[in-house]
Amino acid sequence: LLAAAGSAIGLGNLWKFPYLMGRNGGFTFLITYLVFVLILGVPVMMLEMSLGRYTGRDPVQSYKIVHPKAKIVGVFGVIAPFIILSYYSVIGGWIIKYIISYATTFDAPADFTAFIASPETVIWHLVFMALAIAICYKGVAGIEKASKIMLPALFVLLIIIMIRSVTLEGASVGLKFIFEPKGGFTLSSINAALGQVFYSLSLCMGITITYGSYLSKKENIPKSCGLIAGMDTMLAIFAGIAIFPAVFVFGLEPGQGPGLIFGTLPKVFEAMTGGSIFAIAFFTAITSAIALLEVVVSFAIDSWGWSRKKAVAVMGITVFCLGIPSALSFGVLGDITILNYSVFDFIGMI
């Protein structure tokens, strides 16, 4: 349960959900999102988890058991996490760099733009992937053990920052940005809420099927899916309360995405909580990363008959190599574009 919850709780919870909520009607968006979670998110999660438990196999083999022609759906469910992780681990590497900077100098790197333009990012990308590989290497037990430590720590740190943030003078502006109803239900806000449900709960990405294949027959799937969706939504709301009051108090731009975490928020939070914001970011990144890696590892084990050790090593190294262009796309490979996007942005857009 905690491993599946960790897969759903990702970096997007820290900046994407609160920002979408603020830009698409505030409390109105939240209501729309919760309705979609109940009528689509949880049912789809239950279907995927039930399929995984019924077959006990990876996404490709699971869909093949349902119908041979449905195998292609499972193939896309394996390819997507493979590509996403190559991009995700680059950001994970940035986070580790920031955590180490705080641990050694009690400060963030001076220039985020200069840092991501340097080849050094490849090293941190490697370190992050090595951690994900080490956890997946130990199998489901290793993933569950890591999640039991990281998820509670994540919530504790977030609550600490949340309490400090709402006590800032002028914090009400940030809270109004998130929660104040703004307009009615528009097509764009409904579309944003629907897309966020599938993105945030990691639906149709093979993750839920993979974790479902590890569930015992005694596990209550409706209850588990409800708890996962509830934890994911709660963390996203907590993140908004923790981050956006400070963003508005200090006159920052709320729609910066990753740049908000790495470029501007360190200046805001260093006097408040030091590197805690990056500890939170690391916990969300690593739990999602091991879930993404586990999908392709499970595929290699079930479809190709590989041992876990071989699958984790080969797939992990392959993902690392695939992520190198993204890591270098702000510097050495900065002139290379795909449809007018940098390699990093193009992979992220996919």
Can you say where each PLM-predicted feature lies in the sequence?
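Loop-to-transmembrane helix boundary motifs in multi-pass membrane proteins
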Residues: 1, 119-123, 231-237, 275-278, ...
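Transmembrane helix-boundary motif of multi-pass solute transporters/channels
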Residues: 1-34, 206, 212, 222-226, ...
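Membrane-interface "cap" regions at the ends of multi-pass membrane proteins
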Residues: 1-15, 44-49, 53-65, 71-72, ...
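Inter-helical loop and helix-membrane interface segments of multi-pass membrane transporters/permeases
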Residues: 19-24, 54-76, 89-140, 169-192, ...
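Membrane-interface alpha-helices at helix entry/exit sites of multi-pass transporters
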Residues: 28-33, 65, 71-76, 109, ...
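Hydrophobic core segments of alpha-helical transmembrane domains in multi-pass membrane transport
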Residues: 33-42, 77-102, 123-137, 152-165, ...
